Amino acid sequence: MQTLQTTSLRVSENQLFILDQQALPQETRWLAADNVALLVDHIHTLRVRGAPLIGLSASLLLALLAQRGLNRDALQQALETLRAARPTAVNLMNNLDRMKQALAREDYPQALEAEALRLVEEDKQLCARIAEAGSALVKPGSRLLTHCNTGGLATAGVGTALGVIALAHRQGKVTNVWVDETRPLLQGGRLTAWELGELGVPYQLIADSMAASLMAQGQVDAVWVGADRIAANGDVANKIGTYSLAVLAHYHQIPFYVAAPQTTLDRYCPNGAAIPIEQRAAAEVTGVAGSFGAVQWAPTGAAVYNPAFDVTPAGLISGWVLDSGVVTPAQVAAGAFAPDNG
């Protein structure tokens, strides 16, 4: 396969490497992901994360395995194992559905490579179109709040919500970005803060619990988040804490936007209640660990509830910013995300 490089993925000498997102920002460390078990482990441990990036990494690995001579049955088994790696992120399923079609072809090694590379290029283009559509909604002098990480680390391109923010800043419309630390794994504090710093976008890091106070003081002009899955009725599954922000924004009459590619749409999922929510290990809440070290602050044996995602009802969302443009609440209510409109 040809050499390929994005912010978080690299293909070199027919091997897949991922940027270890658990090591950032203290270390920039690339890890091999050249077999299914290894990539699944990287996904489970969030060394590779972000709904678009997970789907792309799985697709690239399948293509590389085919280049190494794995037969169709072995590739099908690999595909199903990868498909189960992150149940909430629908981009993974959508990408692998396309790879499955390529696998059915007579020339499947070449077809898988072509499809994987096509998915990467499409994601770059989708991100650019999302940024263009979303930046038009950002008013001059805006102070924006974002949650988790939705930039180039999570995609092959400029990102989704963070791509919007970055472009709006280049257009001179963003004066400050409030970055939720995003407990329990601190994707905002570790990753979004790092990306915004690299891009030269002014930001201030806040604890998640500070968002309400900022909104009450009139310090937030809009909230921008990404999505791991969008249901047919417009409900959105995203990083835990997103729903809280949507409720707060609604109360304070602040626009709340979701930015995502159409690959995040699940037109056959009727509503948020049907979205599977991944439950994660207690250790993520009882303490913290990373390249910066590890500490446990809760009592040993403390009972923990740790869902990775929550669901924001469509009624709290001001607009869904897709690569096809901005979708309004009225359009969603009229069936814009329904199966027969796909």
From Swiss-Prot:
Protein EC: 5.3.1.23
Keywords linked to the UniProt accession: Amino-acid biosynthesis, Isomerase, Methionine biosynthesis
Site entry (Transition state stabilizer), positions: C148
Matches recorded under InterPro entries: IF-2B-related, IF-M1Pi, IF_2B-like_C, Initiation_fac_2B_a/b/d, M1Pi_N, NagB/RpiA_transferase-like
Coiled coil: none
Pathway this chain belongs to: Amino-acid biosynthesis; L-methionine biosynthesis via salvage pathway; L-methionine from S-methyl-5-thio-alpha-D-ribose 1-phosphate: step 1/6
Reactions it catalyzes: 5-(methylsulfanyl)-alpha-D-ribose 1-phosphate = 5-(methylsulfanyl)-D-ribulose 1-phosphate
Residues annotated as binding substrate: R49, G50, A51, R86, Q187, N238, K239
Active site: D228
Pfam families associated with the record: IF-2B
Transmembrane among keywords: no
Signal peptide stretch: none
Swiss-Prot/TrEMBL GO biological process terms: L-methionine salvage from methylthioadenosine
Molecular function GO labels: S-methyl-5-thioribose-1-phosphate isomerase activity
Top-level EC class: isomerase
Function: Catalyzes the interconversion of methylthioribose-1-phosphate (MTR-1-P) into methylthioribulose-1-phosphate (MTRu-1-P).
Protein family per UniProt: Belongs to the eIF-2B alpha/beta/delta subunits family. MtnA subfamily.
Protein name as catalogued: Methylthioribose-1-phosphate isomerase
Species the sequence originates in: Klebsiella pneumoniae subsp. pneumoniae (strain ATCC 700721 / MGH 78578)
Gene transcribed to yield this protein: mtnA
